[in-house]
Amino acid sequence: MKIEKTEKKETCCDVIPAEVIKLLEEQLVNEMHNMRVYQTFAVYFNNIGLNSLYSYYKTRAYEEFHHYSNICEFLDNNLVKYNFIEIPECKIDIKNSIDPFELTVQLELDTTDAFYEIYELAEKNHDYITIQWLMKPNGLIEEQSEEMRTSYKALEIANMNLDWISKADAILKLL
């Protein structure tokens, strides 16, 4: 009797569910958008002479680029075929120096929600590769939690009844 063994050859890209890949593609766009928003805030603060807040937002922009790169690296390392979605135009109307901090909190809340949506979808699909990657020490979920704390603290300082030089220096020290 001859037994034929048929094997399903699974590539890494077959392991990451298509729905998870779609959310990761969307997150690439979100990270680049957030980076551009933070660069816009950096320029705003530079133009009004608050160099500490320029540095703060340049660093925040770099963190967003780091997330973007981390997602690309994860997809590349797992041989995932993915697409770049167009990044929407960045139009920000800054009315006062508090606006950037309020918008930062909202952007970071949205980003946190997006990462947990990816996590929950990965969990639903038994995608343990993505779950492990998101939850590893210094992984995206841990970093995102830290960014949320920093954003809330920065907004709290920005709302204090102090001069902007003092507030700017205190906010920069959060990083």
Residue ranges, per PLM feature:
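Iron-associated oxidoreductase/ferritin-like identity signal
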Residues: M1-L175
